[in-house]
Amino acid sequence: MAGLRLIVGLGNPGSEHARTRHNAGFHFVEALAEKAGARWNVDSKLFGETAKVEIAGQTVWLLKPATFMNLSGKSVTAAQRFWKIEPEETLLAHDELDLAPGVARLKFDGGHGGQNGLRDTIRLLGHGKFHRLRVGIGHPGHKDRVVGWVLGRPSKDDEVLISRAIDDAIDVLPLAVQGDFSEAMKRLHTPK
């Protein structure tokens, strides 16, 4: 399988959203950029902010859509077209209600599971054949509380767990960039 050339963090722009659960995808790519010493640049033609990093000896583009979550696909598909990157060479990092804080999972293909950034990307691509990093944020317990939950800040304990899951995902990312997703999944999904 081809490696990764584009990693997108899904989230909402603006300081009021910066520390929310819904921005777990942004937190992931921001941590990657910080680790690599990369700087973010506004790129209006791609409807977001971009950074270039080197992982496992390969150039990888990072993207934070500035379109708000529900319209993320516009930015994702613009970047894929501009850099001539296939969906299969793309990873979307996003918050995941169905995983507990502290858990991160890699996945390829599938539906959107109610995640609006994935929903819009799938709508514009016409399929879901791209990689995902699902960063667990937990569930509030009842579907009527989901919107407030994802747009709210996690507790200090959950914030630590989410950061730990992001670090764990960063540790296996070189394998995914090189195309060894099965080993990356095995290492990320095996409890320590």
UniProtKB/Swiss-Prot annotation:
Protein known as: Peptidyl-tRNA hydrolase
EC numbers, comma separated: 3.1.1.29
Role noted for this protein: Hydrolyzes ribosome-free peptidyl-tRNAs (with 1 or more amino acids incorporated), which drop off the ribosome during protein synthesis, or as a result of ribosome stalling.
Sites annotated Stabilizes the basic form of H active site to accept a proton: 95
Keywords, in A-Z order: Cytoplasm, Hydrolase, RNA-binding, tRNA-binding
One Gene Ontology cellular component annotation held by this UniProt entry: cytoplasm
Signal peptide (from-to): none
Similarity comment text for this entry: Belongs to the PTH family.
InterPro entries reported for this sequence: Pept_tRNA_hydro, Pept_tRNA_hydro_CS, Pept_tRNA_hydro_sf
Active site, UniProt feature: 22
Binding sites annotated in the UniProt record for tRNA: 17, 68, 70, 116
Site (Discriminates between blocked and unblocked aminoacyl-tRNA): 12
Subunit structure: Monomer.
Domain of life: Bacteria
Enzymatic reactions: an N-acyl-L-alpha-aminoacyl-tRNA + H2O = an N-acyl-L-amino acid + a tRNA + H(+)
Gene Ontology BP annotations: protein quality control for misfolded or incompletely synthesized proteins; rescue of stalled ribosome
